Amino acid sequence: MDRTLIQEILEVVEQAAIASAHLTGLGKKDEADAAAVEAMRKRMGKIEMQGRIVIGEGERDEAPMLYIGEEVGSGSGPGVDFAVDPCEGTNLCANNQRGSMAVLAASDRGGLFNAPDFYMKKLAAPPSAKGKVDIRKSATENINILSQCLGLAVSELTIVVMDRARHKGLISEIRATGARVQPISDGDVQAAIACGFAGTGTHCLMGIGAAPEGVISAAAMRALGGHFQGQLVYDPAIAQTSEWADYTKEGNIARLNEMGITDVDKIYEAEELASGNNVVFAGSGITDGLLFHGVKFEPDCTRTSSLVISTLDNTARFTNTVHIKDGAKSIALS
């Protein structure tokens, strides 16, 4: 991958964000997702690359495009693997709430873990805590370590947790330490990445979310030098989700084994989930969030706010783009 390709990857998430933003607040989460998928796929098709979707909208028979294994791009050029979530936080987008974004991770071939559509226990923390906090430790232990690493009192720490029934005990434990809990309804990718930047007011992400999004978070945190660990969750009693109402622990283990995952309890580091030589994260806000603004529509232009993080040159670039409409008469500076 080179800088030209990275610029095109940025445009992929910008176009997906704009497409979804036209449906923000209309209560149409499926339509918003479909619009983002179509826009992302269309822009990817214009890139000189041999692209491949390793994490996408589902298996080939489950999704019309951006399905797992789909080839994208011109068919010539560098081989690139993608993990995509064209509209992360579809409910947030549908209800015009904070935190929805178009997001992807990219790497050279074989550089992204092909995560199954399972749940994942996650731990994200700032670079100063990398290798010191550990997903095997209790929330209390990790909070005390985090306090020491950041030079903050425990009461000054904010821990982000998905607002789910399965996290009732975790939230109680965090609050018992004196740390603050910030529950989120959806969209833990942006929350995880925010832990990698000072000044966001977010210091740690704990709890269980979707495994595919864990790979995207890991790619960003690896490029930032932040801490990220993930462990697949296969026990329905732990996941506590209606989606697994008919599943069993033994059945899920068998499913993982069929996918080639025999060590079902393995703890994955960021460098294992995103192991490529060149790893890129790109995200563009659909609605306002922790890291960037959402799409803004104006008479003569559309504005997007995005972030690209790359191991190629060890940079994190925040980009505000003005997409000028045909026949525009005047463009405000901001």
From Swiss-Prot:
CDD domains: FBPase_glpX (cd01516). GO terms for molecular function: fructose 1,6-bisphosphate 1-phosphatase activity; metal ion binding; sedoheptulose-bisphosphatase activity. Belongs to the FBPase class 2 family. Gene3D superfamilies: 3.40.190.90, Fructose-1,6-Bisphosphatase, subunit A, domain 1. Transmembrane segments: none annotated. Its cofactor is Mn(2+). Catalyzes the hydrolysis of fructose 1,6-bisphosphate (Fru 1,6-P2) and sedoheptulose 1,7-bisphosphate (Sed 1,7-P2) to fructose 6-phosphate and sedoheptulose 7-phosphate, respectively. This is D-fructose 1,6-bisphosphatase class 2/sedoheptulose 1,7-bisphosphatase. Mn(2+) 2 binds at D85, E88, E213. It holds the Pfam family FBPase_glpX. It catalyses: beta-D-fructose 1,6-bisphosphate + H2O = beta-D-fructose 6-phosphate + phosphate; D-sedoheptulose 1,7-bisphosphate + H2O = D-sedoheptulose 7-phosphate + phosphate. Homotetramer. Keywords: Calvin cycle, Carbohydrate metabolism, Hydrolase, Manganese, Metal-binding. The keyword Magnesium does not apply. Its EC number is 3.1.3.11, 3.1.3.37. GO terms for cellular component: cytosol. GO terms for biological process: fructose 1,6-bisphosphate metabolic process; gluconeogenesis; glycerol metabolic process; reductive pentose-phosphate cycle.
